Each structure stands twice: as structure tokens, then as C-alpha cells.
């Protein structure tokens, strides 16, 4: 297995979130490792959260498993049941179909770096705290189905 040169993979902070939901993830930088390495059966991202940044809006996936491991720094995991501090070496997992909305918030003063892996067919998902859903064709809509 060849070593992956992270510096050769573009690091971006794009988001498809409509305003104002895009503001919370402005300090999230990520590299999509799967496409750059030829992996096609699951997604893998190398993510850096700058202090104050969120990984996403609090969300869930209808048909996608998600697994995360913190490499360095720390972040607050926010879920339906409350908050849990994650530090380097900690892992978290959400099976497909779980509606336990989740995200990370970097509430510290150092970067938090993590790997997140997702597998399964994209059939959309939801957002716990805001009026937004994500569709299977990669669109953001209000919970009543009207587009942003």
C-alpha cells in the first residue's frame, strides 16, 4: 500500500450549505482522500478544524455509516444526548439510519485534526437544529421540501 502524500491533495474549505449555515464551517479545511487514491467503495476525509470551527451542522445520514478518529487536538462532540470531549486517539461511530444528529465543535485554542470515513449509498439525511434536509441528489432543502 503506497503512502499517501497529504500535501499533494488539495485542501479546501468549500461547503454547499446555504447562508447563514455556511458561516459555522468557515474554519473547516478538508482533503477528500478517497477520490485522490482511487478508493470508490467508501469516502475518507482528512479534516482540520481551526479554533471556533464546526465540522458541519449537526446532522445524520439516512443510509450511510460514519466513523471518525481524532488524530490531534480536541473537539466537543455534540449529539442528541449531550456533549462529549474527544481527544487524540478517540473514536466515534454512527450507523446508517441513526437519527442521532452529531457534529464536532473546536472550542479550544489549537487545531483539531481527524479522519472521517463514510460508507453506504447517499440517500440523504437531516439536520437536527435547523430547517434543512439533504437530498439524495445533493441538494439542500427546507424540511417541507422547498429549495434554498
Mark where each language-model region is.
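Conserved short histidine dyad/triad with adjacent acidic residue
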Residues: 30-32, 45-61, 99
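Short, charged/polar surface micro-motifs in flexible loops or helix N-caps
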Residues: 50-54, 74, 83, 98-99, ...
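Short, conserved beta-strand element in jelly-roll/cupin
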Residues: 46-50, 61-78, 117-119
Amino acid at each position: 500500500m503506497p503512502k499517501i502524500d497529504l500535501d499533494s491533495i488539495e485542501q479546501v474549505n468549500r461547503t454547499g450549505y446555504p447562508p447563514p449555515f455556511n458561516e459555522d464551517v468557515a474554519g473547516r479545511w478538508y482533503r477528500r482522500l478517497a477520490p485522490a487514491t482511487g478508493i470508490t467503495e467508501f469516502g475518507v476525509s482528512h479534516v482540520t478544524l481551526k479554533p471556533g470551527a464546526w465540522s458541519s451542522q449537526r446532522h445524520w445520514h439516512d443510509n450511510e455509516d460514519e466513523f471518525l478518529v481524532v488524530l490531534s487536538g480536541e473537539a466537543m462532540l455534540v449529539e442528541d444526548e449531550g456533549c462529549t470531549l474527544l481527544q487524540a486517539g478517540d473514536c466515534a461511530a454512527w450507523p446508517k439510519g441513526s437519527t442521532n444528529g452529531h457534529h464536532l465543535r473546536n472550542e479550544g485554542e489549537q487545531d483539531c485534526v481527524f479522519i472521517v470515513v463514510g460508507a453506504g449509498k447517499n440517500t440523504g439525511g437531516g439536520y437536527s437544529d435547523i430547517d434543512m434536509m439533504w437530498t439524495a441528489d445533493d441538494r439542500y432543502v427546507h424540511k417541507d421540501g422547498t429549495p434554498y
